[in-house]
From Swiss-Prot:
Species classification: Bacteria, Bacillati, Bacillota, Clostridia, Eubacteriales
Site (Transition state stabilizer): R18
Family: Belongs to the type-II 3-dehydroquinase family.
PANTHER family: CATABOLIC 3-DEHYDROQUINASE
Pathway: Metabolic intermediate biosynthesis; chorismate biosynthesis; chorismate from D-erythrose 4-phosphate and phosphoenolpyruvate: step 3/7
Protein's recorded name: 3-dehydroquinate dehydratase
Functional summary from the UniProt entry: Catalyzes a trans-dehydration via an enolate intermediate.
EC id: 4.2.1.10
InterPro entries for this protein: DHquinase_II, DHquinase_II_CS, DHquinase_II_sf
Subunit structure as annotated in this protein's UniProt entry: Homododecamer.
Name of the gene: aroQ
Reaction catalysed by this enzyme: 3-dehydroquinate = 3-dehydroshikimate + H2O
Cited NCBIfam families: aroQ, PRK05395.1-2, PRK05395.1-3, PRK05395.1-4
Length: 147
């Protein structure tokens, strides 16, 4: 069985309440349920982790190499400046795909740069919760099922 870790960064626990004009009314729990439902027939276990604390995210990334086949990460605001998360992502030997709910290139200038993208296989941005599904499909089709 394949194990994929989905990491969500700061303030994503506020989805459904925070800036619904940008993120919609869907909650993080709803997103997690939709992801699980989409992959219910796969030989796949999806694990979810959310933290508002940079250090906890770093610890989770570092320990993930021994437990998971890949990571899907939405570093949220940390994507724009966290060299520490970037370094943690570079230190592991499993694939990482970065996801953003909103199109970061249509947002404020400071949101248009993702430093963590440098350690990601790719970045999916602007497709809402479906970006997570796209990332997992990519992982399964290109990295896991091929083996």
């Amino acid at each position: 069985m394949n194990n994929i870790l989905v990491i969500n960064g700061p303030n994503l626990n506020l989805l459904g309440k925070r800036e619904p004009d940008i993120y919609g009314n869907i909650t993080l729990e709803n997103i997690n349920q939709k992801i699980k439902l989409h992959f219910k027939n796969e030989d796949l276990k999806i694990h979810f982790f959310q933290s508002n604390e940079e250090g906890k995210i770093i610890d989770k990334i570092i320990e993930s190499e021994k437990k998971y086949n890949a990571i899907v990460i939405n570093p949220a605001a940390y994507s724009h400046y966290s060299i520490a998360i970037l370094d943690a992502m570079r230190s592991i030997n499993i694939p990482v795909v970065e996801v953003h709910l909103s199109n970061i290139y249509k947002r404020e200038e400071y949101r248009k740069k993702s430093v963590t993208a440098e350690a990601s296989l790719g970045v999916i941005s602007g497709f809402g919760y479906y970006g997570y599904i796209m990332a997992i499909e990519f992982i399964l089709n290109n990295l896991v099922r091929e083996k």
